[in-house]
């Protein structure tokens, strides 16, 4: 099944994105890596991520396609290929825009469009989406893209653009952390309430 194959390949690509991790797998897990139909060299994780992208395109899932682009971007960043990473991560962000336009906007409405860098933007379009009940988006989807974009821009010496993406990444992390804390508190209160009901009954 393309979906599960793609997820497996993408997971491996992420694990081996950095040269040191790849060397570890190459040294300790050669027998497993030899099962694939391409050379086990430094491009191996990139080929896996590209193959995952093909699988997800076949499955036609925007979320997974964006994730595969992020995996490719992560590999390119780890190998100092920052401009290529930036180009790839732009495609990931376009997947988010495409999803948003499909479900929430007229195609010509660009007010909520996400950009890799928008000079002067202090509201960080994309972050407010998370707090809107009517807008369904996955915070981790955007945060992973922003994290890698920050690395790409830093590698290219573009500090403002790097900081912009890093700030969005941190804002999303903070928002999801608070959200999880609230959910945890709610579950705890619910459990306490059930316990109190049992005691009183």
Model-derived segments and their meaning:
Residues 4-27, 67:
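Extended alpha-helical scaffold regions
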Residues 5, 21-28, 40-46, 59, ...:
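Hydrophobic positions within repeat-based interaction scaffolds
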């Amino acid at each position: 099944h393309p979906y599960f194959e793609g997820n497996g390949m993408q997971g491996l690509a992420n694990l081996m994105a950095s040269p040191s991790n790849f060397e570890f797998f190459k040294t300790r897990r050669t027998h497993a890596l030899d099962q694939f139909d391409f050379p086990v060299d430094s491009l191996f994780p990139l080929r896996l991520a590209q193959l995952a992208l093909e699988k997800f395109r076949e499955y036609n899932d925007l979320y997974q396609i964006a994730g595969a682009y992020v995996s490719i971007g992560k590999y390119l960043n780890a190998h100092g290929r920052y401009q290529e990473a930036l180009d790839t991560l732009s495609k990931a962000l376009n997947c988010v825009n495409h999803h948003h336009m499909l479900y929430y906007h007229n195609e010509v409405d660009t007010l909520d469009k996400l950009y890799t860098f928008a000079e002067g933007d202090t509201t960080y379009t994309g972050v407010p989406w998370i707090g809107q009940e009517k807008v369904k988006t996955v915070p981790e989807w955007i945060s992973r893209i922003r994290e890698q974009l920050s690395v790409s821009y830093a590698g290219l010496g573009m500090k403002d653009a790097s900081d912009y993406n890093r700030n969005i990444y941190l804002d999303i992390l903070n928002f999801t952390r608070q959200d999880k804390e609230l959910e945890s508190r709610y579950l705890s209160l619910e459990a306490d309430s059930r316990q109190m009901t049992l005691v009183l009954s």
